[in-house]
Amino acid sequence: PVPRVQLGFFPTPFYKLERMSKELGVNLYIKRDDFTGMNLFGGNKIRKLEFLLGDAMAKGCKAVVTYGATQSNHAMETVSACRRCGLDPILYLTAVVQPDEKDVRANLLLDKVMGAEIHIVDIEPGETEDDAEARSFVMGAEHAARLTASGTPCYDVPMGGASHVGSIGFANGFVELAEQLDELGLNVDYVYHATGTGGTMAGLHAGRKLVGSNAVIRSITVSPKNDAYLTKVQNLANQVLADLGSDLHVDRDVDLHMDTGYFAPGYEQPNEKASEAIKMLARLEGLFVDPVYTGKALAGLIDHIRTGKVEQGSNVVFWHTGGATALFAEQQMLGNIF
């Protein structure tokens, strides 16, 4: 068995969004992974961190290093989980949005409240976000190696928790959803979610194979992605299946459905469709999605319904992966949401 530490409150709620369903002409259900717990601002990463930190503790680690943008949900949830487990959290955060030292907000504020060791990695002139991110990975790995060599074993958690260890948490998540669907006697046609680093996507596909579901999983990207990304997700999913002792396989060309049409103009940059989706859900259901991840995924789903990519009357699940702290982040991330 894979080592696991209990962090979240599962199963997370699952129910129908009656007013949104009526508005859109489909049966729209929501999976509330913003309710995974740990702290007030839970999210999908808790599922992964149960296995990642379980692995870290099984290996005798005392510290954890991880990565993200300055307002990373994953980084904040990792710090929270580390504190719960008695591990020292170290963050290497890329300044996609430059934080204001005098006005620290949202996830970065929470990281500081929890006392994480934070290293801000600025994007140098002539560098892309990806370049700076790659540099942060090297810095973090070197930091972990130094600590380990000096007698404090340090565990390196990849950005977004996207590893075969972390993705087991999301294979479990899909199995959990399947059990909730069974209880309600429901067949689902589509599952929609936001994808960033690919760990959630890989886990969902592994879980779908394990339960033999016919649901089509559609992944709305929050940053530019290409074919290499799909290959990475396929390989991650297949590693998860192998880890769980299954000989089933995810086939990139048959199983993976990714739409890159909703992240523009870029990561952590708002757009009109996401702003409309945020307002629609808030005004019809009193629920919140964020401008970086879930708002863009919901915008993709709404657009797919309106353009007939999702047939009227379909049963659709929107997987809420959390991240509403972004509503309290720097203004340039927000867009026109009221």
Q: What do these predicted regions represent?
A:
Residues 1-338:
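PLP-dependent amino-acid enzyme catalytic core
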